[in-house]
Amino acid sequence: GLMATDGTIETGIYGRKAKSMKLAMVVPDKEHQAMVMEAIYGEKGVKAGFTDGHCKEVLLKAAEHLVRDKGAQALILGCTELPLILEETDNIKLGDGHAAIVDPTASLARRVVKVAGEITKIRGVR
């Protein structure tokens, strides 16, 4: 499942990549997408300096919706601010279900460091 801004979802960047890997990408319905946007841009959202309380509550409701209603097993935090609210984890309980939370920025950082390390070994540089 993907939790991101309306704009990020509309670009289809995550959906196309998932499809190329034969994975289904689900997104929140209109009501729950509004909650994601509220968690980001709302008066008590992360862009207003909040990382707990209301923004976390509504984001967790949207996450639970993706797991319960859409069958998501992993949730991508597709907005750079969302990992400030929810941490990356292999297993979070959401209602009666569970899912992994994926932080794309952290995943990218891990991959970049790994690739840089491999290049360094190949070139014999430290």
Predicted region positions:
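Non-catalytic structural scaffold of enzyme domains
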Residues: G1-R126
